[in-house]
């Protein structure tokens, strides 16, 4: 299974590297004064553009909700100079495949996108989209807490049920495939980056080299299946084959205590969130664990996910599996509520420091944990009944788990022999 996931990383990287479309294309321009043959607003230029055109935007501040419905490139003059201020508006940028089926090959680069009521940048039901080198900040302004209950007045109905704590986060991909979100700074929104299946399956996307920080109400990066399906699971549905690589996720969810660094969640009955890769990220100082995997309802599939090569430090506890001290990674299936066991999870080559518990497991499905470096007092706690293959790990010292000065193991069913005598 690990080799298949490695092949998946190669395939998605190759596929996402070729996002252009052939054919001649014109360039339209925008500047605040509308001089020199340019439009004064981004929306006018985007509407006038033919498919595959480029719209270049000069430095300045533009009070707009930019809706994109055709293939094009939207290029700002750098995020420090080019601002889409969506104060009082739904979104800063809306790549609207939900109302324009088949939308593909859109790129948005070089903007600050701020102050939207909901998502700063929203992508729905579209393919081969690139969102890169943007600063997405201060969005989700509609989030309110009347009577202490979170709500997002005006959020489209296909999002309302599940977006109570974040109003869609800074960047939201729903029903999106073969797309890239890379090199963005996403901060001070309710939540950071969200990949969901509210409007359709999201798969084969690359979330890479983003800095996601100080989003106070929710996770840094959330991969969440909201699919509701009470019958037998069907293949190629939900959230699958997404790669989360090389991101920094820090200090998220601190206001509510509800934010993991990176979260893989199955929220509703029948939700499917499988075959994803979380590799080479840094998760530090978040309110919940650095990486959290939660399955809560019957008929869910949160299987065959790979968590590899991440740097995990100084994150928070998680009440769902019952950890009360800072926790690095947790894998939790609420089997008492009818959730299916989580199977096929591989956790490998991660480095844990500054946690109370490095890895907490609470599922009967079994898990493979190898080639990790545990540097804290409790390396692994098994809170479930499944077997944990924890061979070939480093336990803080060469003596192995529970030796004097080494990390420890708690719970039954954790196999640790042989172990590494040096850090991986």
Language-model segments: residues:
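Functionally critical loop-and-helix segments that line ligand-binding/catalytic clefts
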Residues: 324, 371, 381-424
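The right-handed parallel beta-helix/beta-solenoid scaffold, focusing on the short coil/turn
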Residues: 26, 53, 64, 70-72, ...
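Extracellular beta-strand solenoid repeats
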Residues: 56, 67, 73-75, 83-85, ...
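Right-handed parallel beta-helix/beta-solenoid
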Residues: 17-48, 59, 77, 81, ...
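Extracellular beta-strand/beta-solenoid scaffold signature
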Residues: 85-99, 115-123, 145-175, 187-202, ...
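Bacterial N-terminal signal peptides that target proteins for export
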Residues: 2-13
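Extracellular beta-strand-rich solenoid/capping regions of secreted or surface-exposed proteins
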Residues: 43, 47-50, 62-75, 83-129, ...
């Amino acid at each position: 299974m690990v080799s298949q996931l490695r092949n998946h990383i190669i395939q998605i990287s190759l596929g996402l590297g070729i996002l252009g479309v052939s054919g001649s294309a014109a360039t339209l321009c925008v500047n605040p004064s509308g001089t020199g043959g340019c439009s004064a607003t981004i929306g006018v230029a985007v509407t006038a553009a033919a498919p595959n055109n480029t719209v270049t935007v000069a430095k300045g501040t533009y009070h707009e909700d930019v809706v994109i419905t055709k293939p094009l490139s939207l290029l700002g003059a750098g995020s420090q100079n080019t601002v889409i201020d969506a104060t009082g508006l739904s979104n800063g940028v809306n790549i609207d495949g939900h109302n324009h089926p088949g939308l593909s090959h859109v790129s948005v680069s070089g903007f600050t996108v701020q102050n939207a009521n909901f998502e700063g940048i929203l992508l729905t039901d579209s393919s081969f989209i690139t969102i890169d080198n943007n600063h997405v900040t201060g969005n989700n302004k509609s989030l309110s807490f009347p009577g202490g209950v979170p709500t997002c007045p005006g959020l489209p109905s296909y999002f309302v049920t599940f977006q109570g704590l974040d109003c869609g986060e800074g960047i939201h991909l729903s029903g999106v495939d073969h797309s890239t979100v890379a090199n963005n700074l996403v901060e001070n929104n309710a939540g950071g980056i969200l990949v969901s299946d509210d409007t359709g399956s999201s798969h084969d996307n690359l979330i890479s080299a983003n800095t996601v920080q100080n989003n106070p109400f929710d996770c840094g990066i959330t991969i969440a299946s909201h699919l509701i399906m009470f019958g037998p699971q069907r293949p190629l549905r939900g959230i699958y084959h997404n790669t989360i690589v090389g991101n920094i996720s820090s200090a998220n969810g601190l206001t509510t205590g509800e934010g993991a660094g990176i979260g893989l969640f199955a929220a509703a009955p029948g939700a499917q969130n499988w075959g994803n890769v979380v590799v080479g990220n840094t998760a530090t100082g978040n309110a919940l664990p650095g990486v959290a995997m939660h399955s809560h309802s019957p008929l869910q599939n949160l299987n065959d996910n790979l968590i590899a090569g991440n740097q995990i430090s100084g994150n928070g506890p998680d009440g769902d599996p019952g950890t009360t001290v800072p926790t690095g990674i947790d894998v939790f299936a609420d089997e008492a509520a009818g959730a299916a066991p989580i199977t096929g999870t591989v956790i490998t080559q991660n480095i844990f420091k500054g946690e109370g518990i490095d890895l907490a497991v609470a599922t009967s499905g079994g898990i493979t944990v190898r080639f990790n470096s545990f540097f804290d007092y409790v390396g692994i706690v098994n809170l479930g009944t499944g077997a944990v293959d924890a061979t070939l790990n480093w336990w803080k010292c060469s003596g192995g788990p529970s030796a004097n000065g080494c990390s420890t193991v708690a719970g039954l069913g954790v196999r640790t022999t042989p172990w590494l005598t040096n850090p991986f």
